[in-house]
Design a protein with these regions (language model features):
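A structural signal for the main folded, soluble domain(s) of proteins
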Residues: 18, 27, 69-75
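Short, charged, intrinsically disordered terminal tails
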Residues: 5, 82, 86-93
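Thiol-based oxidoreductase modules, predominantly thioredoxin-like and allied folds used
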Residues: 36-50
């Protein structure tokens, strides 16, 4: 079993059109990877977690790469690809 080296966390909430847009970009980027199994994607809702709600309520969607904020509001596909490539290089070194 391959353990994903890079963790993506998409924080949003239901009914958020920017969250839907972000999910679509992330899904497209992951589908285009040579090794999509090397990246895991977890989606969290601020409605289910008071801590996330307090921290991110006015910034969703928020995309984390390995626990660090990568972007808020809009996900840029090219920037995400570069971040994933960097995360992979960092894991390999």
């Amino acid at each position: 079993m391959v353990v994903p080296a890079t963790r993506l966390t998409l924080i949003g909430k239901p009914g958020c059109h920017l969250c839907d847009d972000a999910r679509n970009v992330v899904t497209r980027v992951l589908a285009g990877l040579a090794d999509p199994a090397s990246v895991s994607l977890e989606e969290l809702s601020i409605l289910d977690d008071a801590t996330l709600n307090e921290k991110y309520w006015d910034e969703i969607p928020v995309l984390l790469v390995n626990g660090n904020v990568h972007t808020i509001w809009r996900v840029d596909a090219e920037r995400l690809v570069r971040a994933l490539e960097k995360a992979q290089r960092d894991q390999d070194s």
